[in-house]
């Protein structure tokens, strides 16, 4: 449940900087006196403490955008709730009929839930998402389970329309930077998810034995202390990301949505690193509220 304070209460309780004239839901917020956070491609973002749930700063963190493949974290949570990692499914043609990114699921081949989770979280396989949905009772049933899980977690602005995050008959879906962090925190509390999202690579079945699949979260290579994340992109969502990093005994989580990368400007990874660096440099007692 959101516990972010209103702008008035925040100013009374703990000196917060809010953009002039903006409502709390549509404001830049960070502790007063803290170093200004540079702009970057993401139009909405949030920085929070992964363990305590304290929000360190945000920009339009409650404004909804399509989540793209970051919604796969929610699918993974449902799968981990309901499936044995060693349970198997034989993929059918419908599972593989997906706009790629794909991990290489083949009709007629048997896969374990764990293999599909690797393909889902490391390379954002839409075919893996479809096949997990197959295991969970079909696309419609799975989407309903995902939305029920989001509601249970307090991610009340999140609405999945497909298991993969691709546009579906119900549109592009929606989430917020706040909700993506709430969902990712819950996922990181699951040891299997935390292990998979931190893997730099894994092996996945192919026609020629096992093939190496490489984690698309470039922060694992670029940012010391990165411990996992999930990327996303569609034309409607633009660039999205949610992920976590650890330093000095602290763990922070960020979410970034609707990234508009400009030629010559900072990349999405640059902005992610900036948000983490800013958060780790902030006094651990400073915050603007809680998730």
UniProtKB/Swiss-Prot annotation:
InterPro entries: Beta-lactam/transpept-like (IPR012338), Peptidase_S11 (IPR018044), Peptidase_S11_N (IPR001967). Overexpression in Mycobacterium smegmatis results in reduced growth, an altered colony morphology, and a defect in sliding motility and biofilm formation. Overexpression of the S69C mutant shows similar results, indicating that the effects produced are independent of protein's penicillin binding function. GO terms for cellular component: periplasmic space. Its main location: periplasm. The lineage of its organism: Bacteria, Bacillati, Actinomycetota, Actinomycetes, Mycobacteriales. Inhibited by the beta-lactam antibiotic meropenem. Inhibited by the non-specific inhibitor phenylmethylsulfonyl fluoride (PMSF). Probably cleaves the terminal D-Ala-D-Ala dipeptide of the peptidoglycan stem peptide. Shows significant D,D-carboxypeptidase activity in vitro. Acts on the synthetic penta-peptide substrate Penta-DAP (L-Ala-gamma-D-Gln-DAP-D-Ala-D-Ala). Also shows weak activity on Penta-Lys (L-Ala-gamma-Glu-L-Lys-D-Ala-D-Ala). The catalytic domain binds weakly to peptidoglycan in vitro. Plays an important role in the maintenance of colony morphology and cell wall permeability and integrity. One of its GO terms (molecular function) is serine-type D-Ala-D-Ala carboxypeptidase activity. Pathway: Cell wall biogenesis; peptidoglycan biosynthesis. GO terms for biological process: cell wall organization; peptidoglycan biosynthetic process; proteolysis; regulation of cell shape. It holds the Pfam family Peptidase_S11. The active site is at 69 (acyl-ester intermediate), 72 (proton acceptor), 124. Transmembrane segments: none annotated. Keywords: Carboxypeptidase, Cell shape, Cell wall biogenesis/degradation, Hydrolase, Peptidoglycan synthesis, Periplasm, Protease, Signal. It comes from the Bacteria. It is found in: Periplasm. The keyword GTP-binding does not apply. Disruption phenotype: Deletion of the gene results in reduced growth in acidic medium under low oxygen conditions. The mutant shows better intracellular growth and survival inside THP-1 cells compared to wild-type and complemented strains. The colony morphology and antibiotic sensitivity of mutant and wild-type strains are similar. The double knockout mutant pknI/dacB2 shows smoother colony morphology on solid agar and exhibits defective biofilm and cord formation. This is D-alanyl-D-alanine carboxypeptidase DacB2. Its EC number is 3.4.16.-.
